[in-house]
Amino acid sequence: MKIQILGVARTGTTNLALSIEKEGYTTILEPYGVNPKKNKTALVEKICVKNISNQFPIDKFKSAYDFQLENIPTFDKTILLDRKNELEHWKSYLNLLKKYHKDPKTTHTIWYEDDITSDWDRKMRNDGFYEVFKLQKETIKKLSNEFKIPITYYEDLFSEDRMYSFETINKWDLDIDPFNVNEYLDPSKRYKQIGKRSQFI
């Protein structure tokens, strides 16, 4: 089975891809990101490709949406990921930008609410990143409508109600053990921590 995970940044795409990798899949993370990777999807039977919804081969397409119109049909299953709570999503996105600017290797580490300042929020908005964020979300919605693929939400996938999250995963009808994937996606693995960092210094 060939699976594509396509989501807005900070919707659990990486953890989901890694959980599927443990089910015997070859995993490719963001082949059209900062450092493009050669596309080997046609060479592997069990493969999971994770893409962010604004990434695409810029030498061949004008937009990520146009690219996915051709890309999605090449997979047996595409999972679309977003978040319901846009404010919390934007804060998480700000954290991603902050860590990436400081040290890209730290983007998948824990963070706290007080890590994000109003000055950083203002700077990222002024630099146009909020528009990028909104475009990612809009692309997911458009593709959901075009291909009639329901959007899976972060809040459901990492829900404290693990039976509900299991049912969410099971509905995808993938060639995986949904119990294993559900266990891997336990809410304790979320990057954002409760409380303030200053309390733990």
Please report, for each region that a protein language model flagged, where it lies by residue.
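Residue-level "edge-of-site" marker
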Residues: 33, 155-157, 182
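Residue-level detector of family-conserved "landmark" positions at structurally sensitive sites
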Residues: 30, 152-154, 179
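Short, surface-exposed acidic/glycine-rich loop or hinge patches that mediate macromolecular interfaces
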Residues: 10, 157-159, 184-185
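PAPS-dependent sulfotransferase catalytic core
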Residues: 1-47
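Short, Lys/Arg-enriched, disordered terminal segments
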Residues: 1, 68-70, 201
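C-terminal accessory extensions appended to soluble enzyme cores
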Residues: 166-201
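PAPS-dependent sulfotransferase catalytic domain
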Residues: 49, 53-149, 154-175
